[in-house]
Amino acid sequence: MFISKEWLESYVEINEQVNVLAERITRTGIEVDDIIDYTKEIKNLVVGYVQSIAAHPDADKLNICQVDIGEAEPVQIVCGAPNVDAGQTVIVASVGGRLPGGVKIKRAKLRGEHSEGMICSLQEVGVPSNLVPKQFEDGIFVFSTEVKPGTDALDALYLNDQVMEFDLTPNRADALSMIGTAYETAALYNVPMTKPETQSTETSDQTNDEISVNIQNEDKVPYYSARVVKNVTIAPSPEWMQMRLIKAGIRPINNVVDISNYVLIEYGQPLHMFDQDQIGSKHIEVRQAKADEEMTTLDNQERQLKENDIVITNGETPIAIAGVMGGDFSEVTEATKHVVIEGAIFDPVSIRHTSRRLNLRSEASSRFEKGIATEFVDEAVDRACYLLQTYAGGSVAQGRVSQGELGCFVTPIDISVSKVNQTIGFELSAEDIESIFVQLGFETTKNKDVLTVMVPSRRKDISIKEDLIEEIARIYGYDKIPSTLPVFDQVTHGALTDRQSKSRIIKATLEGAGLNQAINYSLVDKDRAKDFALQERETIDLLMPMSEAHSTLRQSLIPHLIDAVAYNVARKNSDVRLYELGSVFFANGEDELPDEVEYLSGILTGDYTVNHWQSKKETIDFFVAKGIVDRIAEKLDIQFEYEAGEINGLHPGRTAYVELNGEIVGFVGELHPKTEKDYDLKRTYVFELNFDKLMSVSVGYINYQAIPRFPGVSRDIALVVNRATPSAKLVNIIHEHGGNILQEAEVFDVYEGEHMAEDEKSIAIRLAYLDTEQTLTDDKVNAVHEAILEALKSEGATIR
């Protein structure tokens, strides 16, 4: 968006250098990307009057001009422009002057004739070629009004000006207009903003006698209105309007078209002007296009329309693509006498889809896509009527025809002074806050500590109280906010927290065990979101996912770890060991925020160690995975218990729940054979722990224990049990009956096969006995040992 300082000052009186103004605007969050200075490199540029013209005696394409530039005598200038003529008021660069590009004007002799200056085109004074009016694109510029010779040409051209180029974010559509920028500037400088004149003198003709409108689908077109201006005279628009449009990046065409574009830039409200005589009826109908409907747009291109496109029709034939471009046969031409002015609100999504599909990006479509200010729709049409009456001699018919609702012009938002001060971190009074909103043009009412702010429709970026707080900070000035040190409830000496320390220890432990850290997306496909979940909870689905594969927040880290292993195995890396410390998510219904829980998970497949001259390779199995989990418990100074269990996606006979203080906090086990087959994996083992629960367990101090002074005794037992009996059950029975002298019970062998029944297995357990107070006797050990054996027998175990 290009903002002319001269144009801006017609609404807001500011006495500020443009670079200071640009810096101040940038500090509020609207970035000024560049400043275009039309006075740069220009010197001695004046207005001249061509008194006479004579053909050059030695050059067919040159003319000798006598030009009054406000000095005692006219100067002679040799000019080659095809459109130069006597009686013209032109731009002259006098001797000693400079033009953009480093051009210096000197006395010269052209084909034997002296020339003391240069009659200039707009391109030569810095106007881009694509913006020069067509009648001047191949020649010099000629003023349409009388200007005193010798006047500063930059002043006469309204180019004694600087233009700021805004790099706007999508939320600040209000700054896509001069008036929106004027409101912002007025707030920054705490000065009033003057709105332009919109009141025209209406004739006795009634608009509803001239035209009628109908909307077929108000979901796509909430509001459509039209006014009629008759008997316009097509001519060039005044120079001030042409130059303002040029500085805004728009090429002037004629007064009627220029007024439409001028109001677009002024209000940010796109208008469309139809030649009333060419519409083909007295009725305008707004509808969605029919399948395979066609129309020719202003650029003479035949357009294939789709059913989602919105079109303006004369009741039968499309005459414009709504919000994008008009049709060729209803455009304003040199023959136009009567004009219908359209002001409307169109669905932003529909306009965006249509403009992208047709590759028709315009100033109008870009504003409709972002949403327009309902408060300005009718006002912009009235402004256009006033300008047509003033600069095109038009007669404005009474009233307007419309259908639909404009909607609310303001949105009320309540905000408390205490909330503002708590958020920005320093004290502002209610009067200070109210003053800022008044500066922004927001009406406010006060009830004790609460301000009700009426946010106008032009500020679509403000919808909640936090947005209002941002406005307060912006206009007050981020640079004025006092510097303070942060206040902490608990001040540390720069050490890691307990959780941070434990996290680092666990990561180091896992990496020491040969696992590499993985970091995966928190999103999975919906079908796998509940896989391996320890608890049955509702999932959290994205409203508009980028892909089906990333549509739901995960409830386990295992699915993505399996993907990572499968990816590696498919690329001949068969020995993979990974862990991940990340968040999982559980829904709490529509009214509550979801739970975010940190989990620790791991996955192992292939060989744990490879062949070496000192050792043989070791294939990963259940006990390797369980050993890593035990190592985690050891590092955290806690003790896990294991219980056989079944979890969706894991092998039913090789899976165990991990318990801490009687509560299930995770699992360890082998992937289900079907899962391994689906991913083309060998035996693969996983573990998953609720890391938050591990961190919540308070760990006491480590107590010193003296090295035992007395020898211990170990006994091995072999038990025949049913194959379904878990070894953990036997170990628990042993501990229950081992008394104080049983130090440890460890399974060291499991046998199934020859000499065993099909439904039986043999489990060998080593029992370690120790008395820290005295030497153990056989009698004492035997008594405890026999009690253990009897307990095992009562549970169906047979001693081998």
From Swiss-Prot:
Cell location: Cytoplasm
tRNA-binding domain location: 39-154
InterPro entries recorded: aa-tRNA-synth_II/BPL/LPL, B3/B4_tRNA-bd, DNA-bd_dom_put_sf, Fdx_antiC-bd, Fdx_antiC-bd_sf, NA-bd_OB-fold, Phe-tRNA-ligase_IIc_bsu, Phe-tRNA-ligase_IIc_bsu_bact
Pfam families: B3_4 (PF03483), B5 (PF03484), FDX-ACB (PF03147), tRNA_bind (PF01588), tRNA_synthFbeta (PF17759)
GO molecular function: ATP binding; catalytic activity, acting on a protein; magnesium ion binding; phenylalanine-tRNA ligase activity; transferase activity; tRNA binding
Predominant cellular place of this UniProt entry's protein: cytoplasm
Keyword ATP-binding on entry: yes
Keyword Protein biosynthesis set for record: yes
Gene: pheT
Cofactor note: Binds 2 magnesium ions per tetramer.
SUPFAM superfamilies on file: Anticodon-binding domain of PheRS, Class II aaRS and biotin synthetases, Nucleic acid-binding proteins, PheT/TilS domain, Putative DNA-binding domain
Protein name: Phenylalanine--tRNA ligase beta subunit
Any one GO CC term of the record: phenylalanine-tRNA ligase complex
Species annotation: Staphylococcus saprophyticus subsp. saprophyticus (strain ATCC 15305 / DSM 20229 / NCIMB 8711 / NCTC 7292 / S-41)
Enzyme Commission code(s) on record: 6.1.1.20
Binding site for Mg(2+): 461, 467, 470-471
